[in-house]
Design a protein with these regions (language model features):
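Gly/Ala-rich beta-loop-alpha elbow adjacent to hydrolase catalytic centers
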Residues: 93, 97, 101
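Conserved alpha/beta-hydrolase catalytic His-Asp/Glu region
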Residues: 117, 127-128, 143-203
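Flexible "cap/lid" loop of the alpha/beta hydrolase fold
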Residues: 102-107, 113-144
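Conserved HGGG/HGGXW glycine-rich cap/lid loop of the alpha/beta-hydrolase fold
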Residues: 10-60
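Active-site loop/oxyanion-hole signature of alpha/beta-hydrolase fold enzymes
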Residues: 51-92, 253
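Post-His helix in hydrolase/transferase enzymes
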Residues: 245-257
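Conserved loop-alpha-helix segment in the C-terminal half of the alpha/beta-hydrolase fold
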Residues: 41-43, 200, 205-239, 245
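N-terminal cap/lid segment of alpha/beta-hydrolase-fold proteins
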Residues: 1-13
Length: 260
């Protein structure tokens, strides 16, 4: 896969990890951004033409000051689809990216093919409150997000040696920039009343969850299914919240079966 750049009419300029051929699939990342190693996207690009844009405020993407609320994020998603020259692509999103993809599908229900949501944010159950990721340290994030925290720590830091002060500084600055952007739609809780809009969703929908997810527990999968009649739910063993990175082959098999 290779990096390209997409510029939207609103003025955002976003890096896009692109590769593969065939049916277009646009993948929206979560609050942590795209990690250095992306076996899920690499594998998906063996079957589809994959576009994985970075949100403004992530990596070298610019224009974060232009996005202020959930509607801005959803419209930005469609602006990116237009900038990429795509017509009715499949949309997929992980965590925060799943929340945005679902909002996009409610906003323009006939403008996408199918919808894939991997451990999406966006709903709230009082009996299962979602932990505040903005109050956690990096090592705490790994314990919360990954089935294997040690491996997760290496993935989150890109293998950087955080005992090196410069590496630690660079990691924290990047993390703060990413979380400042994510906080616009996730803080103080990741609930922007999406449940009231899901009735508009017309696309066939697949919901995928990690059985060991400790951030957004699998009980949320049942709530999504209740709000999206006909939605298919798959729960993957050996994965927590970061299932695209923990079980890439398994999630690709499930997606390929669903997308065709």
């Amino acid at each position: 896969m290779k990096w390209t750049v997409a510029e939207t009419r609103k003025g955002t300029r976003c890096r896009v990890l692109e590769g593969g051929s065939g049916t277009p699939v646009v993948f929206f990342h979560g609050a942590g951004g795209l990690l250095r190693d992306n076996p899920f996207l690499d594998g998906l690009a063996q079957r589809y033409h994959v576009y994985a844009p970075e949100w403004p405020g992530y990596g070298d993407s610019a224009g974060d000051e232009l996005l202020e609320d959930m509607l801005d994020f959803a419209l930005h998603g469609w602006d990116l689809v237009d900038a990429l020259g795509l017509s009715r692509p499949h949309l997929a999103g992980h965590s925060m990216g799943g929340m945005i993809a679902a909002e996009m599908a409610c906003l323009a229900p006939r403008d996408l093919g199918k919808l894939v949501l991997a451990s999406p944010a966006g709903l709230w159950l009082d009996e299962h409150p979602i932990p505040d990721i903005f109050a956690l340290l990096p090592y705490q994030l790994a314990e919360l997000l990954f089935h294997d925290p040690a491996r997760g720590q290496a993935l989150l830091t890109g293998g950087a040696d955080l005992s090196d002060l410069e590496a630690l500084k660079e990691f924290y600055l990047g993390s703060q920039r990413r979380l400042a952007m994510a906080g616009k739609i996730l803080f103080p809780i990741p609930n922007r009343r999406l449940s009231k809009r899901l009735y508009r969703l017309a696309a066939e929908t697949l919901i995928v969850w990690g059985a060991a997810d400790r951030l957004i527990v699998p009980a949320y999968a049942a709530r999504w299914k209740a709000l999206i009649p006909g939605a298919r739910v798959e729960v993957l063993d050996g994965a927590a919240h970061m299932l695209p990175w923990e079980q890439p082959e398994a999630i690709i098999r499930v997606l390929a079966d669903f997308l065709g």
